[in-house]
Amino acid sequence: SGLSATLCGAPHGHPLLVELAEQAGVELTAQSEGDLGQRLEAAMSQALCTHDAVLVIGSDCPGLTVQHLHQAARELARHDAVFFPALDGGYTLIGLRRIPTGFFYDMPWSTRSVMPETLRRLVALGWQVWSGEPLADIDTADDLVHLPKHWPAPRVEQMT
């Protein structure tokens, strides 16, 4: 299929990350140092050394499905950048075919301005951008209402 997946996490070598990578049959790589933007740029740049495009997702969006990934990959073949925005103003998935050096520098992370600022920067570059429907991510205890009801999570159930 020409697709590959890598689990990029910290701390590198953590037993849970190792187990997840083994179960999924994917490579485990260390996250670089720095803020979220520096880590994103490093991971994307590394992937783009050997691939034509890269999709990055976080681990906090339970509603992001395989179908979303396939849709994003299809759209990235026709656009310079793709997103599934988060309901809170960020994004749950970002896909790029190239990464300008310093693109994520001074991004207002963890604010409602992340997606609008990212779009502003991409429009300034003249890029074609595709965006899917907004999805919920889990950043706070209040966001736990977005967990699928069928997930067995007894500790979470005690919190909600």
Question: Could you say what each language-model-derived stretch is?
Answer:
Residues 57:
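Catalytic metal- and UDP-sugar-binding loop of GT-A-like glycosyltransferases, i.e.
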Residues 1-4:
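A short, N-terminal amphipathic alpha-helix
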Residues 64-88:
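Conserved donor-nucleotide/metal-binding helix-loop-beta segment in metal-dependent transferases, i.e.
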Residues 6-10:
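Short internal beta-strands
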Residues 100-121:
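Short, glycine-/small-residue-rich phosphate/pyrophosphate-handling segment
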Residues 12-18:
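Short, glycine/polar-rich helix-capping loops at beta-to-alpha or helix-loop-helix junctions
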Residues 114-160:
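Conserved alpha/beta core of the MobA/IspD/sugar-nucleotide pyrophosphorylase nucleotidyltransferase superfamily
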Residues 19-53, 111:
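Short phosphate-binding loop-to-helix
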